[in-house]
């Protein structure tokens, strides 16, 4: 009798369920989008009840659409959008307001007030590894407690649950029997003490959040409860393998040891490096977080995010009309004058890690009379690689771990020029994933490993779509990096 794992990937835009077989292969996928609720102030919300309904619907659909016997489902794993925050009543499971999405900055004023208090920003950063920001759930939870009367009332009555999306999905799947989150998601709340591995009473007190309102933190491969998918399965199955989406992708990419890193290229880019089993504080403003806790071992990561990766190509197409589709970029880059020294710094919304210049604006440097369409497109494409190199370089300096290999996924990885240039900059091989469902697969595989269906070798089941080796001479590489750094410094100086 065959056995299957369902990997639920609850993301910003919707919910997927992946059906994974005993060999670790993806058999089928079912999807459902959910509404993006944006008000006039630009606040971004999701309906928790809609997400809960979609979780159950896609998990059932992925079984029904394949004709798999529901009795053959062995377990369920979860990957989720991080930082999005849900408040609900413990006694009824009723959401008390819409979920505050990770993108939403409605808690900015509250966080600014906290940062103005002596020692609070330092306490938060030193304890949680994260810069005090409305991006994280701590500020969102504090905002909910101050602005949603039903939440404050529930807290006073000891009935309030405040959790990240993984906690809400676990609650949904277990019919309210379990209120748990995993270590990776806990580490992104800005309330978790990374060194001690528990909720921080002093940080929670600073934000006005009662620890009693927070979920029980459970090992990422631990047992989060059981589910029959609302009566769909003939018997309850265990929920194991719960991870934030970037952490699940890191796991699926096989970055299980110190010095291994992954970059997901999308509209922006998430860059994450496994720094081993000891906490590493960043001197470059990178986020220090937990990769996961599995097999009783806690592993840490450094993380940096790039705002404009694939979005640069969208800008070239939609705003400048220099290309008709992103696939043209590779050919244009190879056709450009190799002697071109044009640099483009895409600081459309400032520069993030490791530069942290929020007021910076996009700039172009080094144009000559011979600069044409191809040279400009090449500079824009290279800017993606330079930004990711900056984050990787900061990670290597912070951690002292040499980069052994960069593992990548996402649509822009199909750009051969970009991948070669990235490999040349980081000075290491780049391994390109052959499957785009890394987050959901990471959760499913982690669940299967916990159940004894797989070993960690399952991450190699798909192999690589390609491996790119660095080939640029060292002196040329150094010259290009120096030129980029000069361009970034000039951009920051110009807009300061």
Regions found by a protein language model. Name each.
Residues 1-97, 126, 233-241, 258, ...:
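N-terminal glycine/serine-rich phosphate-binding loop of ATP-dependent small-molecule kinases
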Residues 6-8, 108, 115-179, 190-201, ...:
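Active-site core segments that coordinate phosphate-bearing ligands/cofactors
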Residues 32-34, 219, 292, 470:
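Active-site donor-binding loop signature of nucleotide-sugar glycosyltransferases
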Residues 64-101, 128-137, 170-193, 218, ...:
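Short beta-strand-loop/turn "lid" adjacent to the catalytic site in phosphate-handling enzymes
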Residues 68-71, 212, 401:
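Structured loop/turn residues at beta-strand edges in well-structured enzyme cores
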Residues 104:
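Carbohydrate-associated surface elements
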């Amino acid at each position: 009798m065959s056995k299957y794992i369902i990997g639920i990937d609850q993301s910003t835009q919707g919910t997927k369920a992946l059906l994974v077989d005993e060999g670790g292969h993806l058999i089928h996928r079912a999807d459902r989008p959910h509404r993006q609720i944006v008000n006039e102030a630009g606040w971004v919300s999701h309906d928790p009840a809609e997400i809960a309904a979609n979780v159950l619907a896609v998990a059932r659909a992925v079984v029904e659409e394949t004709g798999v016997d529901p009795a053959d489902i062995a377990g369920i794993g979860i990957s989720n959008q991080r930082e999005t925050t849900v408040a609900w009543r413990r006694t009824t499971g009723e959401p008390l307001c819409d979920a505050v999405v990770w993108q939403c900055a409605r808690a900015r004023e509250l966080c600014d007030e906290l940062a103005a208090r002596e020692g609070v920003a330092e306490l938060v950063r030193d304890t949680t590894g994260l810069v005090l920001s409305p991006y994280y759930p701590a500020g969102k939870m504090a905002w909910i407690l101050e602005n949603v009367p039903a939440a404050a009332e529930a807290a006073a009555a000891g009935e309030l649950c405040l959790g990240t999306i993984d906690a809400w999905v676990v609650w949904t799947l277990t019919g309210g029997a379990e209120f748990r989150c995993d270590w990776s998601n806990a580490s992104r709340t800005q309330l978790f003490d990374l060194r001690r591995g528990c909720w921080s009473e002093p940080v929670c007190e600073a934000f006005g959040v009662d620890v009693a309102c927070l979920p029980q933190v459970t090992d990422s491969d631990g047992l989060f409860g059981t589910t029959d998918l609302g009566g769909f399965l003939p018997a309850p199955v265990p929920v194991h393998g719960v991870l934030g989406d970037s952490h699940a992708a890191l796991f699926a990419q096989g970055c299980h040891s110190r010095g291994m890193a992954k970059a997901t290229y999308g509209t922006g880019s998430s860059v994450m490096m496994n720094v081993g089993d000891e906490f590493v504080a960043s001197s470059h403003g990178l986020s220090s977080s937990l990769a996961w806790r599995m097999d009783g071992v806690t592993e840490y990561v450094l993380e940096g995010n790039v705002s404009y990766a694939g979005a640069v190509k969208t800008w070239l197409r939609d705003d400048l009309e220099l290309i008709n589709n992103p696939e043209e970029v590779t050919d244009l880059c190879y056709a450009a004058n190799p002697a071109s020294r044009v640099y483009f710094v895409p600081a459309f919304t400032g520069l993030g890690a490791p530069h942290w210049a929020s007021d910076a604006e996009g700039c172009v440097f080094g144009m000559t009379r011979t600069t044409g369409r191809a040279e400009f497109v090449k500079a824009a494409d290279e800017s993606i690689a330079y930004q990711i190199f900056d984050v990787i370089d900061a990670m290597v300096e912070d951690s002292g771990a040499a980069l052994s290999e960069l593992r990548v996924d996402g649509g822009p990885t199909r750009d051969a020029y970009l991948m070669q240039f990235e490999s040349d900059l980081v000075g290491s091989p780049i391994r390109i994933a052959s499957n785009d469902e890394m987050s959901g697969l990471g959760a499913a595989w982690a669940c299967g490993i916990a159940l004894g269906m797989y070993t960690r070798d399952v991450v190699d089941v798909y192999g690589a779509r390609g491996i790119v080796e660095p080939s640029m001479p060292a002196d040329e590489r150094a010259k290009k990096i120096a030129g980029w750094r000069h361009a970034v410094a000039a951009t920051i100086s110009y807009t300061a």
